[in-house]
């Protein structure tokens, strides 16, 4: 078996920043267990598998493909950064001729289109509802100790818990916050939570560039201790911060050690456009 495989850094214009994802091009269907084996071998937060939907399809000319995402531990229903990476590989390396690509996924049809300053993903917008603190107190205390919390919401569609830190904190605090992910699996084992979002209101005019909000994302439940930049989390964050800031256009920064920027535009049809750059840093052949 020989498969073309790439690694692309998503939500960045520069290599070695943003969130790396492996992208594998499938001419034919793979055995089910082989997807997971390859993802485990790549050992990145996600590996994307792009497959042809029809035998006559062509990676350079067709505009619609199947797309699946796997962490080293399991398949996931949505991954924004690996979708961006997949589009970058098709646009920039395979030289796909189309301006918009459609991916058929577990989360429905997702579209990626070329833009002057990167690639725009058309993603579902997921609401987050108020969450009772006492139900998740052990999880929050385990993760961040006595850090002051301003708001807690839960997204049932994505199984993500959103924890907004107090406005007394700044970006530097969030970047340096030590988060205990090792014990989260023990305190939350009901299956309700699959991801923890920590977020903070932005500082207009602060630190070289103004951002509307900051975040970090942790998902040990699917084998990812901390994800560098997370498109799917921003499908939840966009809904939350749009309501609290009264804005449809936002600029966000995810404060992982690699860091990544995301442009956000809420659409009239109830979806969200998330914009980012991507840099393809590796291409080769997987042999097994």
Swiss-Prot record:
Signal peptide limits: none
Single GO biological process annotation from the record: biosynthetic process
Its EC number(s): 5.1.-.-
Active site: residue positions: 46
Gene3D superfamilies per record: Diaminopimelate Epimerase, Chain A, domain 1 (3.10.310.10)
Keywords: Isomerase
Enzyme class label: isomerase
Any one Gene Ontology cellular component term annotated for this protein: cytoplasm
UniProt GO MF annotations: identical protein binding; isomerase activity
Top-rank taxon: Eukaryota
The keyword Acyltransferase is annotated on this UniProt entry: no
Subunit structure, interactors included: Interacts with UNRIP/MAWD.
Family designation: Belongs to the PhzF family.
Protein name: Phenazine biosynthesis-like domain-containing protein
Protein's organism: Homo sapiens
């Amino acid at each position: 078996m020989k498969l073309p495989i790439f690694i692309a850094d998503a939500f960045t214009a520069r290599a070695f920043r943003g969130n790396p994802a492996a992208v594998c091009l499938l001419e034919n269907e793979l055995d089910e267990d082989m997807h997971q084996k390859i993802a485990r071998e790549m050992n990145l937060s996600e590996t994307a598998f792009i497959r042809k939907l029809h035998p006559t399809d062509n990676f350079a000319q067709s505009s619609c493909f199947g797309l699946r995402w796997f962490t080293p531990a399991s398949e996931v229903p949505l991954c924004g950064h690996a979708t961006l990476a997949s589009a970058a590989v098709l646009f920039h390396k395979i030289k796909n001729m189309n301006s918009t690509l459609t991916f058929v996924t577990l989360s429905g049809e997702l579209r990626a289109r070329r833009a002057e300053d990167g690639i725009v993903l058309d993603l579902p917008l997921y609401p987050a509802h108020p969450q009772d603190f006492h139900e998740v107190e052990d999880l929050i205390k385990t993760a961040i100790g006595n850090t002051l919390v301003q708001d807690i919401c839960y997204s049932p569609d994505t199984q993500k818990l959103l924890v907004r830190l107090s406005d007394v904190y700044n970006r530097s605090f969030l970047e340096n916050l030590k988060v205990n992910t090792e014990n989260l699996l023990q305190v939350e084992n009901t299956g309700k939570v699959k991801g923890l979002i920590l977020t903070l209101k932005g500082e207009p005019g602060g630190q070289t560039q103004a951002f509307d909000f900051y975040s970090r994302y942790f998902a040990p439940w699917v084998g990812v201790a901390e994800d560098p930049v997370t498109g799917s989390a921003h499908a939840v964050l966009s809904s939350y911060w749009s309501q609290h800031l009264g804005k449809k256009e936002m600029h966000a920064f995810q404060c992982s050690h690699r860091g990544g920027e995301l442009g956000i535009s809420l659409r009239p049809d109830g979806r969200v456009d998330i914009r980012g750059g991507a840099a393809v840093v590796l291409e080769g052949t997987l042999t097994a």
